């Protein structure tokens, strides 16, 4: 036992002497942590776009949607140093273009530019079997138009042979009440015009003969001036000259409040609170597009939307700049669909 204790003491002394004589070594570096996934690329860091980007819009050349789209993406291209090619793909009140973009690659090189006036009505009425609010990746909103006007042929204008002699909204509604289904309303099924027409029928207690003569403003104006329909709901800019010339009468504007530059009462003022609509113009990608790309384009669009030059383009149509990011759209657009459903069911 004594031998064992002596041996242990000897070993302890050896270790102690060795420690005293050795140089002090730096503390070992901590073990590396487990590798973490890379952070998503910041919008400014992502190498996009590196080539031509395709932008599809669902309406004809020369209209408000086309004008805003081309004005926007010309400026986007200038800022990002690439070409954004705009293609007009009409049909189905925007459905054809929407489905076309849905079926394309979500690589950041395919974009849908549309206004959601018609789109959300289609979703609320289940006209489409897809969702504008869920089956795309939202990018941003760039403008709003609240200038839908209800017009008819004036009794003393150049098209007076097609006039009913109306001078006011109440004149037209009186005839519609006296002759249910006789006043011919130019609708576009599955669109904003269908919705506001239904709201006016409900608020005023009338029934129109709803006739779909085509989706473009040109088609519907030709039908009005040719006597095929009696009343048309249309963007004010498309009828401004006719009204000022005395060829058409404006019976009201479908906005919540008076629109700057348009000296006509709203339907709300005239006692029809549900005859309200607004067209918000949005940029969307195919679902699953990299959010770094989405955010980069959104930030670029925000700069343009806030510029005086873009506001001037919109003002020619009495529209206004409106920027909303994807997060805002993801909340507000589905809520608007539910409001439309409630209005149609109420």
Regions inferred by a protein language model and the residue ranges of each:
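Short helices/loops that flank or line small-molecule/ion binding pockets
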Residues: 95-106, 174-177, 198-203, 218-232, ...
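Hinge/capping helix and adjacent helix->loop/strand transition within the periplasmic-binding protein
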Residues: 76, 103-108, 124-219, 267, ...
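Short, low-complexity disordered leader/linker segments with a strong preference
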Residues: 1-52, 346
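N-terminal (or domain-start) structured segment
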Residues: 34-137, 182, 189, 206-231, ...
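C-terminal lobe and pocket-closing loops
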Residues: 239-307, 331, 335-338
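An extracytoplasmic/periplasmic, membrane-proximal ligand-sensing/linker region
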Residues: 50-52, 202-208, 291-346
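A ligand-binding cleft/hinge motif common to bilobed small-molecule-binding domains
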Residues: 117-129, 194-203, 226, 230-265
């Amino acid at each position: 036992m004594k031998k064992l204790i002596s041996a242990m003491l000897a070993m302890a002394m050896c270790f102690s002497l060795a420690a005293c004589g050795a140089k002090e070594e730096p503390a070992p570096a901590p073990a590396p942590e487990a590798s973490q996934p890379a952070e998503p690329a910041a919008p400014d860091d992502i190498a996009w776009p590196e080539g031509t980007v395709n932008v599809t819009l669902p309406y004809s050349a020369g209209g408000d949607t086309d004008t805003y789209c081309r004005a926007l993406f010309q400026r986007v291209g200038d800022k990002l140093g690439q070409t954004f090619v705009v293609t007009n793909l009409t049909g189905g009140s925007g459905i054809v273009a929407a489905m076309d973009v849905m079926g394309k690659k979500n690589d950041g090189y395919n974009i849908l530019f549309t206004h959601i006036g018609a789109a959300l009505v289609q979703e609320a009425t289940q006209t489409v079997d897809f969702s504008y609010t869920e089956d795309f990746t939202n990018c941003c909103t760039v403008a709003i138009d609240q200038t839908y006007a209800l017009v008819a042929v004036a009794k003393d204008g150049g098209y007076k042979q097609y006039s009913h002699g109306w001078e006011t909204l109440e004149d037209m509604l009186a005839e519609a009440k006296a002759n249910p289904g006789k006043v011919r309303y130019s609708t576009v099924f599955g669109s904003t015009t269908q919705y506001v027409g239904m709201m006016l029928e409900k608020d005023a207690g009338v029934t129109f003969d709803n006739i779909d003569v085509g989706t473009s403003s040109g088609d519907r104006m030709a039908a009005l001036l040719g006597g095929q329909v009696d009343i048309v709901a249309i963007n004010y800019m498309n009828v401004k000259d006719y009204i000022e010339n005395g060829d058409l009468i404006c019976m009201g504007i479908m906005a919540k409040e008076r629109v700057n530059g348009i000296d006509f009462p709203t339907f709300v003022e005239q006692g029809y609170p549900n005859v309200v609509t607004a067209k918000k113009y949005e940029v969307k990608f195919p679902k699953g597009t990299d959010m770094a790309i989405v955010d980069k384009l959104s930030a670029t669009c925000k700069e343009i939307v806030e510029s005086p030059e873009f506001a001037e383009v919109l003002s020619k149509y009495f529209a206004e700049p409106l920027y909303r990011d994807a997060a805002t759209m993801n909340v507000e657009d589905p809520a608007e669909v539910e409001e439309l459903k409630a209005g149609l069911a109420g």
